[in-house]
Amino acid sequence: MKFGKFSFRRKITSYTKVQSIVSDFIRCKPVFIKRKRIQGLTLLNVGCGPFPNKSFINLDYCWTPEIDICWDITRKPYPIESASLEGIYTEHCLEHIGFNDFENNMREFFRLLKPGGTVRIIMPDGEIYLDIYQRKKNGEQVLMPHEETYLTPMARINGIFRNHGHRFIYDFDTVKKLLEKAGFKDIKKESYLQGRDKFLLIDTESRAIESLYVEASK
């Protein structure tokens, strides 16, 4: 395997190929969980990617040095004790897994949360794109998020549904029904940096224009 140009100024763990090798080796192996660092933490960030937060247990499919748990959330239950979390946060992650896996994860979230705990789910909002598409067909001069890089509005629709490894794009009604099915209550559509638990408001500003924000309680 070629690693490309090497620099002594970079840590070896900063190379994408190194991270990929480590990910494949440690993924879903509890022995590699950073249990000492996450001891006592009651907030979970699912799919944190390159934006881990020290106040959270940071879980991702791809390993980097800051990841606490390298895990495939479509293969095994979360390696976290039931009813041990105050909050769960996930931003632009769950659209990358299949519909059935999403449903399974809602049940897992319910298991992990303490009574009264909150889940905050952020993902691309299919309704935003479809609504703007119809408005454009009706003659309005409006643009979908990031539409300028696509050939036509329909190409943009396909982009949000198919690009970047997306498996399923949701609207509020679909997420609400799946949360209800898992046992959640008080399910509400929120907005950027608005929600019931201030500790879960770590949203990425650049994603606000296209995102669906949903919160629910156990």
Where are these regions (language model features)?
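Generic, low-specificity signal for short hydrophobic/alpha-helical stretches with a mild N-terminal bias
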Residues: 28, 38-41, 91, 157, ...
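S-adenosyl-L-methionine-dependent methyltransferase catalytic module, highlighting the catalytic core
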Residues: 101-104, 108-114, 118-217
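Conserved SAM-binding loop
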Residues: 41-131, 214-218
